[in-house]
Swiss-Prot record:
Domain of life of the source: Eukaryota
Species per Swiss-Prot/TrEMBL record: Clitoria ternatea (Butterfly pea)
Disulfide bonds listed in the record: 4-17, 8-19, 13-25
Domain remark from Swiss-Prot or TrEMBL: The presence of a 'disulfide through disulfide knot' structurally defines this protein as a knottin.
Lineage: Eukaryota, Viridiplantae, Streptophyta, Embryophyta, Tracheophyta
Chain positions of cross-link Cyclopeptide (Asp-Asn): 1-28
Record keywords, A-Z: Disulfide bond, Knottin, Plant defense
Protein name: Cliotide T21
Length: 28
């Protein structure tokens, strides 16, 4: 539940991060 630097609007999240709300990348 920590916000990652990248977003997932135009590309998928990187590494341990997952896409939330189709907008912001989060990790545990």
């Amino acid at each position: 539940d920590l916000q990652c630097a990248e977003t997932c609007v135009h590309s998928p999240c990187i590494g341990p991060c997952y896409c939330k709300h189709g907008l912001i990348c989060y990790r545990n």
